[in-house]
Amino acid sequence: MSTKFLIAILLLLLSSPLAHSQNQFVTTHGKQFLTPDGKPLILRGMNLGNWLVPEGYMFKFKTANSPRLIETVINQLVGEDEARGFWKTYRDNYITREDIHLLKKLGFNSVRIPFNYRLFISADDPTKLEGDGYQLLDRVVKWCKQEGLYVILDMHAAPGGQTGDNIDDSFGYPFLFESNDSQELTVKIWQKIATTFQNEPTVLGYDLLNEPIATHFDANYFNPKLEPVYRKIVSGIRMVDKNHIVFLGGAQWDGNFKVFGPPFDDKLAYTFHKYWFTVNQEAIQEYLDFRDKYNVPVWMGESGENTDEWMSSYRTLLEKHDLGWCFWPYKKVDATSCVASVNRPADWDEVVNFANNPRSTFEEVRKARPAKEKINNALGAFLENIKLANCRLNRGYLNALGVGQAIE
């Protein structure tokens, strides 16, 4: 076979649609993320928390703190039929094209989108991969593509529960690691999501499991189970998608990287979360050491819920070490530690009191339920107030993250 012929074949392969497609994606190179044109990419992102995984504290609820418990509150207030309408409007209003446009204008270059697996299966038959989640992700990814924001998709609540707390919408135990059925469903959902976005470069990567294995549980028992589950999910994704980066979070709230061996895929990145600590070099040294040891990208995928001064100090430390970041959260009720604060509606305290009162018996539910007029007023106003046009921006929060200079 002649040299000219081999060169011709090589040029043909390099010019093929597949090669062209792969060159459109952010990839990894050593410790860095690289843009399609080969430039280093430092992620400056925002978590769209409370949209597809509601959390009680962002509603000002205390005991109703997981999606299931919050859904129960709304069901008990208005019934299942009206509740379905409430959640549809909630998801349509909470994150819109205007929100994505704002984030880009503020100076962010990426968003992390936490999602609940229940939005990706049939409520009647969990083996059917049908649900509103696919359309919701497709819509927001298209907005991000139009605005020029990268997207990291985050399975915040996995089948069976990967954390064993309110944030994973579980029943208080990380059953995922003991259930083959839950693991298989997790793989299938990720496969379908990966199939959907396999050729979409706006999606930067997949954050497989948010904050697996809470500190409440026996780490010696659970931690050895984590990487095998990750390997199973990655293997499933790679059957349909070899383009995207896969993010692995450590055990114990994404903080413990000792569970990891050497990287087992050529497009792996590792993500840590860190809240409520004294900001200094020592606090992040283990993640820097891990990055150096394995020559892989490391990304700070969540932090926040603190003072503006603390946020600024932490963000500066991360940037000093070329660590990309994604702070938490974008929007919540009546708060300063977010980009956009939702104004508390009139009569909202009636809803909050109902959510916080004992409701373990039908009698307690009846006694706690506010008047129908107050319920309707509060929920209706809430659905209007979550629209960006009705929110207020927190200038101190934006300044702390070094963004927002384009907004007067």
Stretch-by-stretch model annotation:
Residues F25-V26, E184-K332, S337-A355:
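Extracellular glycoside hydrolase catalytic/binding regions
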Residues W310-E408:
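Aromatic-rich peripheral "rim/lid" segments of glycoside hydrolase catalytic domains that contact
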Residues F5-S15:
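Sec-dependent N-terminal signal peptides
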Residues A19-S21:
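Boundary at the C-terminal end of the N-terminal hydrophobic targeting segment
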Residues T28-L43, L48-I245, G250-K258:
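Active-site mouth of glycoside hydrolases
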Residues L14, V151-I152, W299:
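Conserved Rossmann-like nucleotide-binding pocket used by diverse enzymes
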Residues M1-S2:
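N-terminal secretory signal peptides that target proteins for export/translocation
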